[in-house]
C-alpha cells in the first residue's frame, strides 16, 4: 500500500511573501532572467515548495500578478455604468504608474512565451474580462445600453486599450483624470450612453 502524498498548503502570509519576491525579481531582472532558484533564495523557501504549489514559473508569475493586482474589477458596482467606469478609471489610473517596470517586463515576455501567455489568460485575463462583461450585462439589465449595441463586443478592448495605448503613443501614464475623460468621450458614446 502506498502513502498518499499531501500537498501542504501555504499560509496566506507566506504566499504573499513568495508573490512579493516574484514581483521584485521580475522588476529587477525581467521575466526571462528570473529563475525558480532566485525566487526560492529570495523568499527563503525550497524549489520543491515552489513546484509543489505551482507547476512552474509561468503559473507562479500569473498567480503573483493575480494576488497583487491593484484594481479589483469585481468590487466595482455603483449602480450605473457611468459610475462604474469612472470608479474603475480612478482605480486603474492610481495603479497605472505603480508597476511600469514589472508590466513592461511581462508585456515583453508574453510576446515570446506561450506558457506565460496561457497562464495569464487563464488566471488573470479571462476572469477580469468576465467581470467587465458582467458590468455591461448589469448596464443592459438596467436599460442603460441596448443589448445589441455594436460596441458591446469591444467593451473590454475600449476600457483596457486606453491604459496600454497612452503610454506607447504619448509616453504618459493613463491617470484617473485622463481615463475619466476617455470614458466620457469614447466609451460611453460608443455604447450609446448620453
Where is each model-derived feature located?
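Hydrophobic alpha-helical connector segments
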Residues: 72-102
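Hydrophobic/aromatic-rich alpha-helical bundle segments in the mid-to-C-terminal region
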Residues: 118, 122, 126, 140-185
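Short amphipathic alpha-helical segment with a characteristic S/N-K-E followed by hydrophobic residues
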Residues: 18, 33, 56-61, 71-72, ...
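Amphipathic alpha-helical packing segments from all-alpha helical-bundle domains
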Residues: 97, 105, 115-142
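C-terminal peripheral helix-coil segments that are non-catalytic and often amphipathic
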Residues: 1-5, 87, 94, 130, ...
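Basic, helix-initiating cap at the start of DNA-binding domains
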Residues: 1-29, 33-44, 48, 59
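Short loop-to-helix capping motifs
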Residues: 56, 112-114
Amino acid at each position: 500500500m502506498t502513502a498518499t502524498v499531501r500537498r501542504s498548503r501555504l499560509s496566506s502570509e507566506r504566499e504573499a511573501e513568495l508573490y512579493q519576491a516574484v514581483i521584485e525579481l521580475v522588476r529587477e531582472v525581467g521575466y526571462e532572467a528570473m529563475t525558480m532558484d532566485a525566487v526560492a533564495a529570495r523568499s527563503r523557501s525550497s524549489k520543491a515548495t515552489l513546484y509543489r504549489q505551482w507547476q512552474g514559473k509561468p503559473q507562479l508569475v500569473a498567480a503573483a500578478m493575480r494576488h497583487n493586482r491593484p484594481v479589483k474589477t469585481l468590487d466595482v458596482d455603483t449602480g450605473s455604468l457611468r459610475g462604474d467606469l469612472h470608479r474603475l478609471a480612478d482605480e486603474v489610473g492610481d495603479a497605472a504608474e505603480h508597476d511600469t517596470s514589472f508590466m513592461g517586463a511581462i508585456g515583453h515576455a508574453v510576446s515570446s512565451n506561450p506558457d506565460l501567455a496561457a497562464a495569464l489568460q487563464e488566471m488573470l485575463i479571462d476572469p477580469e474580462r468576465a467581470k467587465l462583461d458582467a458590468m455591461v450585462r448589469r448596464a443592459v439589465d438596467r436599460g442603460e445600453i441596448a443589448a445589441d449595441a455594436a460596441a458591446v463586443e469591444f467593451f473590454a478592448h475600449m476600457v483596457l486599450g486606453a491604459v496600454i495605448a497612452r503610454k506607447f503613443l504619448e509616453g504618459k501614464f493613463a491617470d484617473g483624470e485622463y481615463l475619466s475623460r476617455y470614458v466620457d468621450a469614447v466609451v460611453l458614446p460608443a455604447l450609446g450612453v448620453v
